[in-house]
A protein has these predicted regions:
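C-terminal motif of bacterial Sec signal peptides marking the signal peptidase cleavage site
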Residues: 46-49
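A cross-kingdom marker for long, charged
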Residues: 332-370
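Immediate post-signal-peptide N-terminus of mature secreted/exported proteins
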Residues: 53-92, 151, 158-194, 203, ...
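Short Gly/Ser/Thr- and charged-rich N-terminal loops/segments
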Residues: 8-11
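Coil residues (strongly favoring Ser/Thr
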Residues: 86, 99-100, 108-109, 127, ...
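Intrinsically disordered, low-complexity segments enriched in Gly and acidic/Ser/Thr residues
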Residues: 274-334
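Long, low-complexity or tandemly repetitive, helically biased scaffold regions used
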Residues: 106-134, 141-154, 186, 225-236, ...
């Protein structure tokens, strides 16, 4: 299993949401456009793993492969209003077929990008993507459906090496929620301690797995205290937290580049760390909204996006490293979102139907990128 690192942003999520929302209008069209932009551009991690390229079909010629691919497209065009289970199954079948077809035509002796069979393959591939998107949009979808599709069609499904590494890391992350909350001195003291810790960690760097675990553990201690004051930070500039968090994460990747830390550990632990934070952010947002702690519309907009953020930003690796508990928690958030969004729609005068269509838009973006 090979891991590659790409540039990613840190996460002081409320600040990011505030910056995004600064120029956003509170009408429904603005909300939808904003969410699409976030789903396509705002990413905490961009993590990729290489496919082995193996399929289950074998073709004797490019002609045979293209005919099979065309037949698959024809069958898709006859499908309508499919269940999410059927859509997931179809996507997985297409991936196997696509690997086989692309592998077969890559052996073709005539390699002309815009001619047969390569040009035909690309045209069919584009048409299949269009049909899969149509199928995704053929019925009303929920956040539960979106998570199910992401889970079932992840490119890491069946990766035993990854699952073993995740299993070994789970006890460490499970222990984080038992850490005490240290909020002595109020919100400004909490913010100051958090920032000092990040600055110190960025300066010292990460020099091995032991340093990585120590950083994640202590960071979560300050982050957990920070969440207690989340609504109170709505009007505060916490850009220093975001920038120093990014710096610390870059130090982890530099440690992997120096081979002080394996790329596998860097990617898995960073993904699991981010999952943990996204979940706790969304849970805190729901709790704060239900307790009446969120009063102003500006913060409500931010909280709306915070609740949806896990479904916008998690990539294949992030979904694949979710523990059973975190996965169950994420499904609970998915099931709670319709009610929470309905309540916010009334308070913020948003179009409820357009908000309810958000999972479909996110699903379309996901399928388009397959």
């Amino acid at each position: 299993m090979k891991y590659e690192t790409q540039l990613f942003g840190g996460q002081a999520n409320l600040h990011c949401m505030k910056q995004i929302l600064h120029n956003a209008k509170s009408n429904s069209h603005g909300c939808i456009r904003l969410a699409i932009c976030i789903a396509t551009a705002f990413a905490v991690f961009m993590l990729t793993a290489c496919s082995d390229g193996n399929g289950t079909k074998s073709f004797r010629s490019s002609d045979e492969a293209i005919r099979e691919y065309h037949g698959f497209l024809t069958n898709l065009r006859q499908s309508d209003k499919v269940t999410i289970q059927s859509l997931a199954k179809t996507i997985n079948e297409w991936r196997v077929l696509d690997d086989s077809v692309s592998s077969c035509i890559s052996r073709d002796t005539v390699r002309k990008a815009h001619s047969y069979p390569f040009g035909t393959y690309r045209e069919l591939n584009d048409s299949i993507h269009i049909e899969l998107c149509r199928m995704a949009m053929s019925k009303q979808r929920t956040f539960h459906d979106l998570l199910y599709l992401r889970e079932q069609t992840s490119s890491h499904v069946g990766d035993e090496e990854l699952q073993q590494a995740v299993k070994e890391a789970q006890p460490f992350f499970a222990s984080l929620d038992s850490l005490p909350i240290y909020n002595k001195g109020g919100k400004q003291a909490v913010l100051k301690r958090y920032l000092l810790f990040l600055q110190k960690s960025a300066k010292q760097g990460i020099h091995g797995k032991e340093d990585l675990l120590a950083f994640i553990k202590e960071e979560h201690l300050y982050f957990k205290s920070f969440l207690q004051y989340l609504p109170d930070f709505a009007d505060d500039d916490i850009g220093d937290i975001r920038r120093n968090t990014e710096h610390c994460c870059r130090e982890i990747l530099r440690a992997a580049d120096r081979k002080d830390l394996s790329h596998k550990d860097a990617m898995i632990y960073l993904s699991m760390r981010t999952n943990h934070r996204l979940l706790r952010n969304a849970q805190a947002a729901i709790e704060d909204l239900n307790s009446g702690r969120v009063k102003d519309e500006h913060t409500m907009h931010a909280y709306l996006l915070m609740m949806m953020q896990p479904f916008m930003t998690m990539d294949d690796l992030s979904v694949s490293v979710l523990s059973d508990k975190d996965k169950a928690d994420l499904y609970k958030i998915a099931d709670a979102l319709p009610k929470e969004m309905d309540g916010l729609a009334k308070k913020l005068h948003l179009d409820k139907q357009r908000l309810s269509d958000m999972p479909m838009l996110m699903m379309k973006i996901y399928v388009t990128r397959l």
